[in-house]
Amino acid sequence: MTTVLAIVIFFITLTLIIWQPKGLDIGISAIIGALLVIITGVVNFTDILEVIGIVWNATLTFVSVILISLILDEIGFFEWSAIHMVKASNGHGLKMFIYIMILGALIAAFFANDGAALILTPIVLAMIRNLGFNNKLVFPFIIACGFIADSTSLPLVVSNLVNIVSADYFGIKFVEYLMRMFIPNLFSLLASILVLWFYFRKSIPKTFDISSISEPKDAIRDTRLFKISWIILALLLIGYLVSEFIHIPVSFITGAIAVIFILLARQSNVVHTKQVIKGAPWNIVIFSIGMYLVIFGLKNVGMTLILADILSSIAQHGLFSSIMGMGFVSAFLSAIMNNMPTVLIDAIAIDQSHAISSIKEGMIYANVIGADLGPKITPIGSLATLLWLHVLVQKGVKISWGTYFKTGIVITIPVLFFTLLGLYLTLIIF
């Protein structure tokens, strides 16, 4: 009976999160699920404490990074960067396509996939419309912004909430994670550029007139804060690198930097700090705790052991098969039931599997790659994608779920394969 309850509660929670009836917040949906598993006795008080211990650092780090990115957006930092990329293309369509993806990859690395997709996309959309592109020409650039935000959100622990949760679960330190995922991220970037170019090659204009694009300096709304932002970024990077050596949770460092930046931004006329703070994804904290408790319910009734047995079987076929198998399992599960519950279920199953340590390491990182890229197959793969599609509708661009799936599955599978190949080469060479 307990097993049935755990499964039913999981699917009820998942349905509420994806469907969001009457705008029901994802945090509330996850808490409803959490309360149900607590009331029914599927999880206990010890589980609650364990879950909070796992997710608090991850979620607070994520919120801090998004806060910093929102202030940077307010002062025109990302628009300034995007204009530079367009100007650098010198009127060459393919160059602009590639440069925008490189910019998206950089933003995703340092400010998470959500920041890259939700901040960069409206900026790029406004610029290419200003260039006089019709809807057929707009589509490749919009898809590229959304895709690259996830496909290159691998290199740093903070680049994706999925990364943070998995790294915290397995106790992976910042530098250790970077050393393993830097090369796979490069493979993903190169594969993304090649696959997206091949798919959209007939829709990318050969040339365009850049005379209508304003100068980069015109995008800067607060020169003082713009200059300070470079110091903030330097401190952020240093903080990432030294956090594990000084044994301070990375959320303390990112949180402190975010608070300092907010206090400095309060003196600016262009940054509305109250709106920035309100716009941060605080519901992610509640969502993560609630969703994790629901997943722990599945673990407690032995459901994750089924997946663990499957992974143990895959592990017997060697490192390459283990990485590919885990990566594609994670990707398709993410596409079907969202990447957050997927990465949690997979992480627990990997931990419970009988794979040897070297194989298990490959599976841990392959799970992250699959959960980062898998959401590009379907709109429900990640909460960020659903929000991204909603933002596009508000901007007058409607992408149907059918169009998204038809495009997403063709683009994602080859990129996923080459990214996992990059991980395999990293682990056998280094």
Curated annotation (Swiss-Prot):
GO annotation, biological process: response to arsenic-containing substance
InterPro entries: Arsenical_pump_ArsB
Disulfide bonds: none
Membrane topology: Multi-pass membrane protein
Chief location of this protein within or outside the cell: membrane
Any one GO molecular function term: arsenite transmembrane transporter activity
CDD domains the record matches: ArsB_permease (cd01118)
Transmembrane region(s): 4-24, 26-46, 51-71, 100-120, 138-158, 181-201, 223-243, 245-265, 276-296, 317-337, 373-393, 409-429
Subcellular location(s) per record: Cell membrane
Pfam families, alphabetized: ArsB
Keyword annotations of the record: Arsenical resistance, Cell membrane, Membrane, Transmembrane, Transmembrane helix, Transport
GO annotation, cellular component aspect: plasma membrane
Protein task: Involved in arsenical resistance. Thought to form the channel of an arsenite pump.
Similarity annotation: Belongs to the ArsB family.
Name of the protein described by the UniProt record: Arsenical pump membrane protein
Protein species of origin: Staphylococcus epidermidis (strain ATCC 35984 / DSM 28319 / BCRC 17069 / CCUG 31568 / BM 3577 / RP62A)
